[in-house]
Swiss-Prot record:
InterPro entries: SlyX (IPR007236). This is Protein SlyX. NCBIfam families: PRK02793.1. HAMAP family: SlyX (MF_00715). Belongs to the SlyX family. Residues 55-65 have a biased composition (Polar residues). Pfam families: SlyX (PF04102). Residues 52-72 are annotated as: Disordered. The lineage of its organism: Bacteria, Pseudomonadati, Pseudomonadota, Gammaproteobacteria, Enterobacterales.
Length: 72
C-alpha cells in the first residue's frame, strides 16, 4: 500500500515539474521579448533626446558665462 502511495506522490511531483518547466519557458520568452522592447525604447529615447537638444539651444547660461552672486 505504501508503494502505491509513493508511486502516486512521485507521479504528482513529475506532473508538477513538467508544468513548472512549461511555465518557466513561457516566462523566459516573455522576459526576452520585454528586454528587446526595452532596448528599442531606450534607443528611441536616446534619439529623441539628441534631436531635442539639437533643435533647441539652451537658455541656461553655462557656468563660465554666469555672473557670480553679489556677495562674492
Amino acid at each position: 500500500m505504501q508503494d502505491l502511495s509513493m508511486e502516486a506522490r512521485l507521479a504528482e511531483l513529475e506532473s508538477r515539474l513538467a508544468f513548472q518547466e512549461i511555465t518557466i519557458e513561457e516566462l523566459n520568452v516573455t522576459v526576452t521579448a520585454h528586454e528587446m522592447e526595452m532596448a528599442k525604447l531606450r534607443d528611441h529615447l536616446r534619439l529623441l533626446t539628441e534631436k531635442l537638444k539639437a533643435s533647441q539651444p539652451s537658455n541656461i547660461a553655462s557656468q563660465a558665462e554666469e555672473t557670480p552672486p553679489p556677495h562674492y
